Protein backbone atom coordinates (compact mmCIF):
# COMPACT_ATOMS: atom_id res chain seq x y z
CA UNK A 1 0.00 0.00 0.00
CA UNK A 2 1.41 3.34 -0.97
CA UNK A 3 2.27 6.15 1.34
CA UNK A 4 0.02 9.10 1.86
CA UNK A 5 0.41 11.62 -0.92
CA UNK A 6 1.05 14.93 0.78
CA UNK A 7 0.67 14.21 4.44
CA UNK A 8 3.25 14.27 7.16
CA UNK A 9 3.71 11.45 9.62
CA UNK A 10 6.25 11.76 12.35
CA UNK A 11 8.86 14.44 12.72
CA UNK A 12 10.75 14.82 10.52
CA UNK A 13 9.94 11.55 8.76
CA UNK A 14 8.37 8.17 9.32
CA UNK A 15 9.43 4.87 7.89
CA UNK A 16 9.26 1.48 9.54
CA UNK A 17 8.26 -0.67 6.58
CA UNK A 18 6.59 -0.41 3.23
CA UNK A 19 7.39 2.24 0.65
CA UNK A 20 7.88 5.49 2.49
CA UNK A 21 9.61 8.66 1.47
CA UNK A 22 10.77 11.70 3.38
CA UNK A 23 7.35 13.31 3.51
CA UNK A 24 4.91 10.44 3.45
CA UNK A 25 3.51 7.98 5.89
CA UNK A 26 3.51 4.37 6.83
CA UNK A 27 0.94 2.37 4.84
CA UNK A 28 -2.54 2.83 6.32
CA UNK A 29 -1.26 5.40 8.77
CA UNK A 30 -3.27 8.14 7.14
CA UNK A 31 -6.30 6.16 6.16
CA UNK A 32 -8.18 6.11 9.44
CA UNK A 33 -8.55 8.33 12.44
CA UNK A 34 -6.27 6.12 14.51
CA UNK A 35 -2.56 5.66 14.43
CA UNK A 36 -1.13 2.32 13.52
CA UNK A 37 1.01 0.65 16.19
CA UNK A 38 4.35 1.31 14.48
CA UNK A 39 3.50 4.21 12.23
CA UNK A 40 6.15 6.55 13.49
CA UNK A 41 8.34 4.35 15.64
CA UNK A 42 7.57 3.88 19.31
CA UNK A 43 8.19 7.48 20.31
CA UNK A 44 5.59 8.85 17.94
CA UNK A 45 2.53 6.73 17.40
CA UNK A 46 0.65 4.56 19.82
CA UNK A 47 -1.75 1.77 18.79
CA UNK A 48 -4.64 4.16 19.11
CA UNK A 49 -5.07 7.84 19.57
CA UNK A 50 -7.60 10.52 20.12
CA UNK A 51 -9.68 11.59 17.17
CA UNK A 52 -8.39 15.13 17.14
CA UNK A 53 -4.84 14.05 17.94
CA UNK A 54 -3.34 17.15 19.50
CA UNK A 55 -0.41 16.69 21.81
CA UNK A 56 0.38 19.37 24.32
CA UNK A 57 -2.03 21.91 22.87
CA UNK A 58 -4.00 22.80 24.81
CA UNK A 59 -3.83 19.68 26.94
CA UNK A 60 -2.36 16.23 26.84
CA UNK A 61 -2.56 12.88 28.54
CA UNK A 62 0.09 10.41 29.63
CA UNK A 63 -2.25 8.26 31.68
CA UNK A 64 -4.36 6.76 28.96
CA UNK A 65 -7.36 9.04 29.16
CA UNK A 66 -8.34 11.21 26.24
CA UNK A 67 -10.45 14.27 25.89
CA UNK A 68 -10.94 16.41 22.81
CA UNK A 69 -7.34 17.57 22.68
CA UNK A 70 -5.00 15.02 24.17
CA UNK A 71 -2.92 12.02 23.35
CA UNK A 72 -2.47 8.42 24.33
CA UNK A 73 0.09 7.25 26.92
CA UNK A 74 3.73 8.09 26.19
CA UNK A 75 2.84 10.18 23.16
CA UNK A 76 3.79 13.33 24.99
CA UNK A 77 6.64 11.83 26.95
CA UNK A 78 9.46 11.67 24.42
CA UNK A 79 10.69 13.43 21.33
CA UNK A 80 7.33 13.74 19.61
CA UNK A 81 5.83 16.27 21.94
CA UNK A 82 7.27 17.78 25.03
CA UNK A 83 5.48 17.09 28.32
CA UNK A 84 3.94 20.52 28.09
CA UNK A 85 4.29 23.46 25.79
CA UNK A 86 4.41 25.59 28.89
CA UNK A 87 7.45 23.99 30.50
CA UNK A 88 10.86 25.53 30.06
CA UNK A 89 12.88 22.39 29.37
CA UNK A 90 13.38 20.25 26.30
CA UNK A 91 12.15 22.63 23.70
CA UNK A 92 15.01 22.73 21.27
CA UNK A 93 17.48 25.54 20.77
CA UNK A 94 17.06 29.11 19.74
CA UNK A 95 18.91 32.37 19.50
CA UNK A 96 20.33 34.24 22.42
CA UNK A 97 19.77 33.23 26.01
CA UNK A 98 16.92 33.20 28.44
CA UNK A 99 13.40 32.19 27.65
CA UNK A 100 9.78 33.12 27.64
CA UNK A 101 6.74 30.92 27.89
CA UNK A 102 3.30 31.29 26.43
CA UNK A 103 1.59 33.04 23.61
CA UNK A 104 4.06 35.79 22.88
CA UNK A 105 6.30 37.06 25.58
CA UNK A 106 9.05 39.26 24.32
CA UNK A 107 12.20 40.23 26.05
CA UNK A 108 15.85 41.10 25.83
CA UNK A 109 18.82 41.32 28.09
CA UNK A 110 20.94 44.23 27.04
CA UNK A 111 22.27 43.48 23.59
CA UNK A 112 21.52 39.78 23.93
CA UNK A 113 18.30 38.65 22.34
CA UNK A 114 16.03 36.49 24.39
CA UNK A 115 14.86 33.14 23.20
CA UNK A 116 11.09 32.92 23.11
CA UNK A 117 9.12 29.73 22.95
CA UNK A 118 5.85 30.09 21.09
CA UNK A 119 3.30 27.36 21.62
CA UNK A 120 1.15 26.24 18.76
CA UNK A 121 -0.79 23.17 17.67
CA UNK A 122 1.26 20.13 16.81
CA UNK A 123 1.32 20.69 13.09
CA UNK A 124 4.48 20.67 11.10
CA UNK A 125 6.73 23.62 11.78
CA UNK A 126 8.31 24.37 8.45
CA UNK A 127 11.99 25.07 8.38
CA UNK A 128 12.77 23.81 11.86
CA UNK A 129 13.77 20.58 13.52
CA UNK A 130 11.84 21.29 16.69
CA UNK A 131 8.98 19.25 18.10
CA UNK A 132 5.83 20.62 16.50
CA UNK A 133 4.27 21.89 19.69
CA UNK A 134 6.98 24.48 20.20
CA UNK A 135 8.55 27.19 18.09
CA UNK A 136 11.68 28.77 19.49
CA UNK A 137 12.36 32.08 17.86
CA UNK A 138 13.60 35.61 18.46
CA UNK A 139 10.71 36.94 16.44
CA UNK A 140 7.09 36.09 17.13
CA UNK A 141 5.24 33.91 14.65
CA UNK A 142 2.08 35.37 13.23
CA UNK A 143 -1.18 34.96 15.08
CA UNK A 144 -2.29 32.88 12.17
CA UNK A 145 0.57 30.45 12.68
CA UNK A 146 -0.06 30.24 16.39
CA UNK A 147 -3.81 29.99 16.56
CA UNK A 148 -5.20 28.88 13.23
CA UNK A 149 -3.42 25.58 12.57
CA UNK A 150 -6.34 23.70 14.05
CA UNK A 151 -8.12 20.43 13.53
CA UNK A 152 -10.01 21.84 10.57
CA UNK A 153 -6.78 21.97 8.57
CA UNK A 154 -4.87 19.14 10.20
CA UNK A 155 -5.28 15.49 9.39
CA UNK A 156 -6.08 13.96 12.79
CA UNK A 157 -4.43 10.65 12.05
CA UNK A 158 -1.30 10.71 14.13
CA UNK A 159 -0.95 10.60 17.87
CA UNK A 160 1.01 13.69 18.73
CA UNK A 161 1.96 14.36 15.14
CA UNK A 162 -1.17 15.72 13.51
CA UNK A 163 -0.56 16.49 9.90
CA UNK A 164 -1.14 19.85 8.30
CA UNK A 165 -2.08 20.19 4.69
CA UNK A 166 0.67 22.13 2.90
CA UNK A 167 -1.44 25.29 2.77
CA UNK A 168 -2.81 24.85 6.26
CA UNK A 169 -1.47 28.04 7.76
CA UNK A 170 -1.11 30.06 4.60
CA UNK A 171 -4.63 31.11 3.76
CA UNK A 172 -6.30 31.83 7.05
CA UNK A 173 -7.34 35.34 7.94
CA UNK A 174 -4.90 37.03 10.23
CA UNK A 175 -6.70 37.89 13.46
CA UNK A 176 -6.01 40.92 15.59
CA UNK A 177 -3.83 40.08 18.55
UniProtKB/Swiss-Prot annotation:
One of its GO terms (cellular component) is keratin filament. InterPro entries: KAP. It comes from the Eukaryota. Keywords: Keratin, Repeat. Belongs to the KRTAP type 1 family. Interacts with hair keratins. In the hair cortex, hair keratin intermediate filaments are embedded in an interfilamentous matrix, consisting of hair keratin-associated proteins (KRTAP), which are essential for the formation of a rigid and resistant hair shaft through their extensive disulfide bond cross-linking with abundant cysteine residues of hair keratins. The matrix proteins include the high-sulfur and high-glycine-tyrosine keratins. This is Keratin-associated protein 1-1. It comes from Homo sapiens. The gene is KRTAP1-1.
Amino acid sequence: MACCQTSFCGFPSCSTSGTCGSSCCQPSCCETSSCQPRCCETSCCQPSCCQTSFCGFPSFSTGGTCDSSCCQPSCCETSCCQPSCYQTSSCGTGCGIGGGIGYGQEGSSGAVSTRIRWCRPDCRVEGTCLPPCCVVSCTPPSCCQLHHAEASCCRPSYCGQSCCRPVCCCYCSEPTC
